[in-house]
A protein has these predicted regions:
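A subset of signal/propeptide-processing and intrinsically disordered low-complexity segments
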Residues: 1-2, 24, 117, 195
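Entry/capping segment at the start of metal-dependent catalytic domains
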Residues: 13-55
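Metal-dependent phosphoesterase core characteristic of DEDDh/y 3'-5' exonuclease domains
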Residues: 40-45, 49-83, 105-212
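Metal-dependent phosphoesterase signature
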Residues: 81-98
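Short, flexible, glycine/charge-rich loop motifs used to bind or transfer phosphoryl groups or to couple energy/partner
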Residues: 15-17, 102-104, 137
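Short strand->helix junction
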Residues: 33-35, 88, 194
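N-terminal amphipathic/basic-hydrophobic helices that include classical n-h-c signal peptides
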Residues: 1-17
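Short, basic/hydrophobic alpha-helical segments
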Residues: 95-109
Length: 212
């Protein structure tokens, strides 16, 4: 039953894509202080809005969010992102300021929020962020024509069902891998700074164009 529900949800988002029911995509990515959506915090948010043909609309967002004093980031997160807590405090928005930007400027009506593994990771951080700041944690992803879409699942489906025309990477043991930075490398897509949120967003848009 769960697999049927999952398939139905993915089919709904696919229909929205090909029919143009929604007006814009907003591709986004997060860099966080750790892996727990409940206990860790967003340190960097980047995103770019496009039309339904993946043409950019307006300027991209690339925002730092100040870590609060009682959040201790994991050393692994700092090594991967290169973002220090001090940098977020010096240059970043407070969570209250950041969540207002998300609510009023980014996740606007008729926006499809798109990411890579976002349904299982990034979206959960956004939900906890809204909850902590007294906003509804779900409306940003369903109300007034809003929805969300995970390109990792599309990549997996494409690799399994229609792999032609795309170079598919394997890991050091020869096993299939769908890591974004390896897909971009295999297909000659510019991705100079993996794990920088804006670089990941631009790479994700290019991979989406490749699949399309």
């Amino acid at each position: 039953f769960n697999s049927i529900v999952d398939y139905a949800l993915k089919w709904r988002f696919f229909v929205m894509l090909v029919t143009g029911m929604a007006q814009t995509f907003f591709f986004y990515d997060l860099e966080t202080s750790g892996l727990s959506a409940r206990d860790d915090r967003i340190m960097q948010f980047a995103g770019r809005r496009t039309d339904m043909d993946f043409n950019p609309i307006g300027e991209p967002y690339n925002l730092l969010v100040a870590l609060n004093d009682d959040t201790i980031p994991s050393p692994e997160a700092l090594l991967v992102t290169g973002i220090s807590p001090q940098k977020t405090v010096d240059e970043g928005y407070t969570e209250a300021q950041f969540v207002k930007i998300l609510n009023e400027e980014i996740f606007t009506p008729d926006t499809i929020a798109v990411g890579f593994n976002n349904v299982r990771f990034d979206d959960e951080f956004v939900r906890h962020l809204f909850w902590r700041n007294f906003y509804d944690p779900y409306e940003w992803s369903y109300k007034d024509g809003r929805s969300r879409w995970d390109l990792l699942d599309v990549v997996r489906m494409t690799r399994a069902l229609r792999p032609e025309g795309i170079e598919w990477p394997v890991d050091g043991e020869g096993k299939p891998t769908n890591r974004l930075e390896l897909i971009t490398k295999a297909n000659g897509i510019a991705h100079e700074n993996a794990h920088d949120a804006l670089s990941d967003v631009d790479a994700l848009i290019d991979v989406t164009k490749l699949i399309n």
